[in-house]
């Protein structure tokens, strides 16, 4: 089965595309990176049984980047509405103004090459035989418990045996004036 696309990214994509279209009129370069990633970890050992969201690998939101003669600016957010498009533009503008104002007299922004933006479209998804979510926490923990018991049964000298599993479902979206890239994968 193919990993399904993120409904969160799908809902926000038209507004993100509109934001890129607005920003490309003002800046030499602009892009938006969106992420919707969910991770879970399971463990069974002598100290107990655990099924929990892995906060380190769970993320959701967007980062917009622009470049002009004043430098680079980035702004991150979790949701976007049509009413907020102008506010995002204003935040980027304020960041670039602050960068320019912070430069010492007589110095200027160090010119760097712009990120590549040749036309490219990509939509890819990994496939998996069984998605961990379809098993459910109870089934995963039951299987890990069986693995732990089998490990303990190998030899009476085995004091403890732990069984652990993590998974992360990753959804990414990258938009620029010439690029529309999406990936959905399970790791």
Residue ranges and their predicted role:
Residues 1-187:
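Active-site bordering "gate/hinge" segments
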